[in-house]
């Protein structure tokens, strides 16, 4: 999967037609939303197995996971503000 993203990035950077800033940002947001959707699908698919494996411990770990996700999203928000 990493190879696919690297190939896409390489093709974008070596394209013969000049890209505008708007097209570039659209491509970035499209790629980011696609990656986040794949992460969401992966979590949705594996969450029941994790809950069975961890037993009652998942009740404690879910708030921690939510906390981590919020911190990561805040990091991206701060990084986007920098632009």
From Swiss-Prot:
Domain of life per record:
Viruses
Its main localization is host cell
- Tell me which family the UniProt entry assigns to this protein: Belongs to the plectrovirus ORF7 family.
Which spans are transmembrane here? 50-70
* Entry GO CC: host cell membrane; membrane
In Swiss-Prot or TrEMBL terms, this protein is called Uncharacterized protein ORF7
UniProt keywords, alphabetically? Host membrane, Membrane, Transmembrane, Transmembrane helix
The way this protein sits in the membrane is described as:
Single-pass membrane protein
Where, per UniProt, does this protein localize? Answer: Host membrane
């Amino acid at each position: 999967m990493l190879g696919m993203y690297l190939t896409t990035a390489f093709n974008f950077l070596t394209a013969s037609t000049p890209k505008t800033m708007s097209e570039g940002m659209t491509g970035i947001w499209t790629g980011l939303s696609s990656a986040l959707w794949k992460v969401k699908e992966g979590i949705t698919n594996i969450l029941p197995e994790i809950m069975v494996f961890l037993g009652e411990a998942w009740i404690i770990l879910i708030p921690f996971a939510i906390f981590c996700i919020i911190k990561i999203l805040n990091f991206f928000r701060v990084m986007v503000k920098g632009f």
